[in-house]
Design a protein with these regions (language model features):
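Basic, flexible Lys/Arg- and Gly-enriched helix-loop patches that mediate nucleic-acid binding at interfaces
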Residues: 2-235
Length: 235
């Protein structure tokens, strides 16, 4: 079956659909020896697709998994000396895209897949997928209701990012909040609490796009089940 070229490339796990479109525009892709054009359709099993002179392998088996990221690990595909990386925790050495990256000081749920198209859809801010975090603060919270209301109304976090909002902000007890975002500026939650001069001791993502971390042990991973995969693919 023929499908649009950029979708075929994303399904192969080479890159996202958006990146594939850039490669097509730059004349870096050939189909059966001919320069590809936007809108071309291909059959991954029959057509020879070359990207920058290298043959694209046919669609691999789809991989969808979750990881409970520990604090101190980075989420990038680039490796740096003397730095721990989440891919060190995974047995699969195939190229995977991390969905919903967490900064080095945060922990919790990260989704990983070789489906570049899905990774783009779940990561791009325009799709506004919800992400839920459990936040433990160092200082005693005196006015939790005021903080929750301000989070939802909007806070100017500066650095040209302007006003950002939380979809949900619920105070539990013992200086713990549950914060829900549909956007993701750099270190957004930390900067929002810093507005109130509050310091985060622990930041843990507990759900992403309707997929929940549950009781998965820290530093461990598991494959998503059929129901979870279908839910993500149909979003």
């Amino acid at each position: 079956m023929k499908i649009v070229l950029q979708k075929a490339i994303a399904l192969s796990g080479f890159c996202s659909r958006r990146k594939a479109e850039v490669l097509i525009e730059n004349n870096e892709i050939k189909i059966n020896g001919q320069i590809a054009k936007k809108g071309d359709k291909v059959d991954l099993k029959k057509d020879k697709i070359e990207i920058r002179g290298k043959k694209l392998s046919s669609q691999p088996e789809a991989i969808y998994l979750m990881l409970n990221k520990p604090r101190g690990y980075t989420c990038t595909n680039r490796r740096f000396p003397n730095e721990k990386n989440i891919f060190d925790l995974l047995p699969n050495k195939e190229r995977l895209f991390a969905v919903g990256r967490l900064d080095k000081d945060s922990r919790g749920l990260v989704l990983l897949t070789n489906n570049g198209d899905l990774a783009f859809k779940l990561s791009h801010p325009s799709f506004e997928h919800k992400k839920e975090y459990q936040v433990k603060l160092k200082e005693k919270v005196e006015k939790p209701k005021l903080i929750s209301e301000k989070f939802i109304k909007g806070i100017d976090i500066g650095e040209n990012d302007g006003i950002v909002k939380a979809v949900g902000a619920e105070y539990l007890q013992n200086n713990i909040f549950i914060i829900t975002l549909s956007e993701g500026k750099k270190r957004q939650i930390r900067r929002m609490f810093n507005y109130f001069k509050l310091t985060i001791l622990d930041l843990k993502r507990i759900s992403l796009s309707g997929i929940f971390l549950g009781n998965l042990e820290e530093g461990k991973w598991r494959n998503l089940n059929k129901k979870e995969i279908e839910y993500l693919l149909n979003k």
